[in-house]
Amino acid sequence: MFKVYSDFSPSGDQPEAIKKLVEGLQKGYRIQTLLGVTGSGKTFTMAKVVEKVGKPTLIISPNKTLAAQLYSEFKSFFPENKVEFFVSYYDYYQPEAYIPTRDLYIEKNADINEVIEKMRISAIKSIMTRKDVIVVASVSAIYNCGDPKDFSDLNFVLSVGQEIDLEGFLTHLARIGYERKEEVALGGTFRVKGDVIEIYPRYQDEGIRIELFGDEIDSIYTFDPLNRKILEKLDRVVIYPTKEFITTEEKIQRAVKSILKELEEQLEYFKKQGKHLEAERLKQRTMNDIELLTALGYCSGIENYSRHFDGRNPGDPPYSLLDYFGDDYLVFIDESHITIPQLRAMYRGDFSRKKNLVDYGFRLPCAYDNRPLKFEEFWNKVKNVIFVSATPGDFEINNSQQVVEQIIRPTGLVDPEVEVRPTQNQIDDLVNEIAKIRKRNERALVTVLTKKTAEKLAEYLIEMGIKALYIHSELDTIERVEVLKKLRRGDVEVVVGVNLLREGLDLPEVSLVAILDSDTEGFLRSETTLIQIIGRVARNINGKVIMYADKITPAMKKAIDETNRRRKIQIEYNKKHGITPKTIIKPLDEEIFKQFMTDEDEEKEEIKTIFELKESLSIEEYIALLEEEMYKAASELRYEDAARLRDELFNIREKLKNKSF
């Protein structure tokens, strides 16, 4: 069913890793871990496992950038199969919120990327209609999605020779999300000219042309919407909904009754509490929504009523992408040391933001049920899971029935040497090391603890004649990727930053990583973080890591020992097989990143909303929220966000100490 196309055959540790993982699935192992070092070909191993197991596959990645990279690779591995992409479709996202002390209501504001929306619909359609499907997704996979039964029930089949009621047919098209437009042909529209109906689904590039003879379908074609060239003549075609959230007239009527019942209960609750302003606000807003739902079948924020449309009880898990797969499918959780903490944190963050909206009468309590899955709910839905990481966390290791190591790189590249040097004169020493790599036309990454240090160090390096830039949290994802593209091209020689792990892009030109303040204990210098940073130079034959420190912390020792263990295994393998390591330079695939760059904008808005809650919470509640969000950001390796929260926490505690509150 699946077939991998590649110029390479499995080598190094790959054949054994593939064999063990496949055998594990055949033995009924629910949870396995692929512990694969950077550059060992984990993606190729994943592809070969999919090929041998032959199940629909979901791959969850921690962000859009990495998801886009995986999507591109799997598309090239599986040209004959359906590889789909499912990530957040927002180009800009400001969540709905309310700040009580300022009486400030912030309306939801979002721009939807039509390309990604189309890819999401295509993914849903492929899962529902094919077995040979691979979906690469971000954590959007656990967010509220339409009911799979609606998507399935509302499609319809058209065949040549079939008699149709034209008016009823066009009404049904409108009902499943298509808009009638006679002039402009866009995805999700249709038009009628005489006996010809042209339909432009969002889930495919081709248009569908239906020619009638009286009430009978005479012919069906697919065509190119740009040049209108006929592509293929069909005997039958299935028309699928063009939106994720599609519902029926019966469901709308049922939902309205249920919403009115909840409204009545919540108004009674507010009146007992003496909250007459909140009651009046809620009544007015909800009745406006009901009026729109009754007249148009839609209202702004309709997703907040999804529980009523789905017929779910309060607290029941929402439908998500996982529900479209059925029972028998394979899940890879890529970069699991980041993705698992993300999956854990999504529900808590969503609930915190909505609490004020419900408490102050902007939303009914059913808004709580328009949410991502809780981690336990997600965990109950997945049956065959393979975690993939160079540094799997305790959860992955402790729950796996098998941990499969992939240490040997087919390229022969060895993990970099790690040196520990004193902090005295560290900047002068760093400049000397940068001078050496510049002569070889190679690049360097320097990781520091604060944004201020990054700025000052980058400025100093520029003064020394070095082409340097710093990456910081104010840069959006496109700008950050642009910096790394400049680094690869040689327009920049050194990048300085607090968090150089986020992108996860291949940087084979980088041969030096310098870690300043390596002996500062904390989330920025944990064992996992240090191993990940060391892996940044594992793709270059001259790879070298310098830790500037005056003592060796337990985290440093563990990271260095693990790196040396991996070096030894690779060196012995190279010697045995006569392999001479070479730096592998991959071309920079710029196109895959252009459409998918909004994760950080959403994270920034979330942090901003947290800071705004300062005025509506007690000091104790605000400190607790800051701590929770700081640890959440750190566990997801979003170190700049964690540092901003840490600084805010420090400022609050200083003010408390000085009694300036």
Swiss-Prot record:
UniProt keywords (A-Z) are: ATP-binding, Cytoplasm, DNA damage, DNA excision, DNA repair, Excision nuclease, Helicase, Hydrolase, Nucleotide-binding, SOS response
Domain (UVR) ranges: 620-655
Example GO molecular function term? DNA binding
* Keyword Zinc-finger listed: no
UniProt-annotated binding residues for ATP: 36-43
Give the Helicase ATP-binding domain ranges.
23-180
The GO cellular component terms are: cytoplasm; excinuclease repair complex
Q: Where is this motif: Beta-hairpin?
A: 89-112
Compartmental location: Cytoplasm
Q: Which domain of life is it from?
A: Bacteria
Q: Which GO terms describe its biological process?
A: nucleotide-excision repair; SOS response
Domain Helicase C-terminal positions: 426-592
PROSITE patterns with a match to the protein in the record: HELICASE_ATP_BIND_1 (PS51192), HELICASE_CTER (PS51194), UVR (PS50151)
Could you tell me which PANTHER family the record lists for this protein?
UVRABC SYSTEM PROTEIN B
- What does the record say about domains? The beta-hairpin motif is involved in DNA binding.
What protein family is recorded?
Belongs to the UvrB family.
The free-text function statement in the UniProt record for this protein reads: The UvrABC repair system catalyzes the recognition and processing of DNA lesions. A damage recognition complex composed of 2 UvrA and 2 UvrB subunits scans DNA for abnormalities. Upon binding of the UvrA(2)B(2) complex to a putative damaged site, the DNA wraps around one UvrB monomer. DNA wrap is dependent on ATP binding by UvrB and probably causes local melting of the DNA helix, facilitating insertion of UvrB beta-hairpin between the DNA strands. Then UvrB probes one DNA strand for the presence of a lesion.
NCBIfam families noted in UniProt: PRK05298.1 (NF003673), uvrb (TIGR00631)
The name on file for this protein is: UvrABC system protein B
